[in-house]
Amino acid sequence: MLLSDRDIRAEIGSGRVALDPFDDAMVQPSSVDVRLDRYFRLFDNHKYAVIDPAEDQPELTRLVEVDPDEAFVLHPGEFVLGSTHETITLPDDVAARLEGKSSLGRLGLLTHSTAGFIDPGFTGHVTLELSNVATLPIMLWPGMKIGQLCFFRLSSPAERPYGSGADGSRYQGQRGPTASRSHVKFHRTHVE
């Protein structure tokens, strides 16, 4: 069940769902707007010949911090990682989905490539997969609205919420844009 503004405020008010910092003005009829942080991960395309999800490639990206009053310029065709300014914490019976803002999509900015789902139990900043599919550069300002979180109540609490396993979860507690950790517990089924 998708939570309404009333339900979102109740979940935040009770402390079950946390957004830090929280601004009530960001609450929409069935979502909460989230803002862009000032940290970005740029891809160093000359460090590796290919990207291999099975391998640890620690020099694939580098962290860039922009001043709070300066924009990050995302050029046409570029892909960078960003993150929400807000830290999100979800209980074991609420999941969330990050969606882009329509106004930014109409300018050619894609907020996430594939990873818009946030598991129950997650805590941390949400990493954004930012792409410019327009023909002009796009200015990304720290603190600007970048997306919206929709919250869903599960039919029952998750048996193993994110971060509860013995091995932990790859992105639990992440701060800022976090590079891929696909190589950790990489799974590949033998296909004949």
Curated annotation (Swiss-Prot):
Molecular function GO terms recorded: dCTP deaminase (dUMP-forming) activity; dCTP deaminase activity; nucleotide binding
Region (Disordered): 162-192
Pfam families the UniProt entry points to: DCD
EC number: 3.5.4.30
Subunit: Homotrimer.
Site (Important for bifunctional activity): 116-117
Name listed for the protein in its UniProt record: dCTP deaminase, dUMP-forming
Pathways per UniProt: Pyrimidine metabolism; dUMP biosynthesis; dUMP from dCTP: step 1/1
Biased composition annotated in UniProt, kind: Polar residues: 171-181
Basic residues: bias regions: 182-192
Region forming the signal peptide: none
Similarity field: Belongs to the dCTP deaminase family.
Residues holding dCTP: 101-106, 119, 127-129, 148, 162, 174
